[in-house]
């Protein structure tokens, strides 16, 4: 068995910007055989990464708080489109404040929507003050965009009316989404040119715990053309794009691939991720958030890590954000993920 201990020799540290309301953190820099960025790019392209990327250690994450959406979603307040968000301490997240509405009906989007001027924000100043010192070129940088196409519609006019608009006003939605896609592409360009992003993480939840909000055919007719614009724009800017979509949305994965997404950040508790990866892993990378609880013994935690690598890493299109909530294990589960996947990928 090959000895990888020297690859886990700490040679320095990285400062990691916080996202989703978290503080900045410090993570170790290891003596890896290739840079974490090169390994992550290999994973996204399906070109034989050497280990399963742990995005907490291997990626830079950017969610500038000069974006009203980021501040409102993380802490409460008013987002880019005038929606009031209320922070809920128990869930450590924000929800639209009850009674808030900015769009009376979808047919009035031209008259009622006030489009945010992205040029009003001093992006370069924000980069210089908050990110320039901590975005290592050794690590892939992804830029977080919340409130995607469907999410934004529900925020503006209520969830129920957004669903009704899909059925009753597809032409009006198409016009609104044309404009919203253009606005997002302008934001993507800022992410690339100012923050040097390598990937967009685009949030658009589309399911409940047991099913999708709408049929694959609705996705094909209404969302697919817009997503194809967004993914093409990212690729033309030499960026990857990962769609974060919670809920039981496995039925939409073939359409995500057709849309041109490079990866899907899916909800483990609502999807059979192994089945999805077995069927689509050669065409779409999977980025997963998973936790190791305080109650798990060391052996139990190791077994969970090994299971993820075995089941989701078969096509080597798997990355994760691994959180271990037990501080006193005596060994690093991030290092265990590295060692186990490093050996597994040699097989």
Task: Please identify what each model-predicted range represents.
Residues 75-124, 135-143:
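A contiguous, low-structure linker/loop signature
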Residues 1-55, 59, 114-347:
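Active-site loop segments of alpha/beta catalytic cores
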Residues 45-47, 51-88:
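N-terminal accessory/capping or targeting/presequence segment of soluble
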Residues 65-69, 89-93, 97-98, 155, ...:
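Short aromatic-enriched loop/helix-cap "lid" or pocket-rim segments at secondary-structure transitions
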């Amino acid at each position: 068995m090959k000895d990888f201990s020297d690859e886990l020799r700490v040679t320095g540290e990285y400062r990691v910007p916080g996202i989703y309301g978290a503080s900045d953190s410090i993570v170790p820099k290891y003596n890896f055989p290739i840079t974490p960025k090169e390994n992550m790019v290999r994973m996204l392209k399906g070109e034989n990464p050497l280990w399963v990327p742990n995005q907490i250690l291997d990626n830079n994450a950017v969610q500038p708080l000069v974006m009203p959406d980021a501040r409102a979603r993380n802490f409460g307040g008013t987002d880019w489109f005038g929606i009031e968000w209320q922070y809920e301490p128990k869930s450590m997240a924000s929800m639209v404040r009850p009674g808030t509405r900015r769009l009376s009906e979808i047919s009035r989007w031209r008259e009622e929507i006030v489009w945010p001027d992205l040029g009003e924000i001093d992006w370069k100043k924000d980069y210089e003050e908050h990110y320039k010192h901590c975005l290592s070129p050794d690590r892939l940088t992804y830029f977080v965009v919340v409130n995607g196409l469907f999410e934004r519609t529900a925020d503006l006019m209520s969830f129920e009316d957004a669903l009704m608009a899909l059925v009753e006003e597809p032409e009006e939605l198409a016009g609104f989404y044309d404009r919203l896609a253009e606005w997002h592409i302008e934001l993507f360009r800022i992410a690339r040119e100012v923050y040097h992003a390598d990937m967009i993480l685009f949030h658009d939840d589309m399911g409940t715990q047991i099913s999708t909000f709408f049929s694959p055919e609705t996705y094909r007719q209404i969302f697919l053309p817009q997503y194809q614009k967004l993914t093409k724009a990212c690729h033309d800017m030499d960026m990857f794009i990962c769609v974060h979509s919670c809920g039981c949305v496995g039925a939409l994965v073939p359409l995500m691939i057709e849309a041109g997404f490079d990866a899907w950040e899916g909800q483990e508790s609502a999807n059979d991720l192994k089945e999805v990866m077995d069927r689509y892993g050669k065409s779409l990378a999977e980025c997963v958030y998973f936790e190791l609880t305080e109650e798990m013994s060391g052996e139990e935690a190791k077994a969970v890590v090994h299971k993820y690598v075995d089941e989701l890493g078969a096509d080597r299109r798997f990355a994760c954000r691994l959180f271990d909530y037990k501080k006193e294990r005596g060994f690093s589960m991030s290092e265990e993920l590295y060692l186990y996947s490093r050996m597994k990928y040699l097989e």
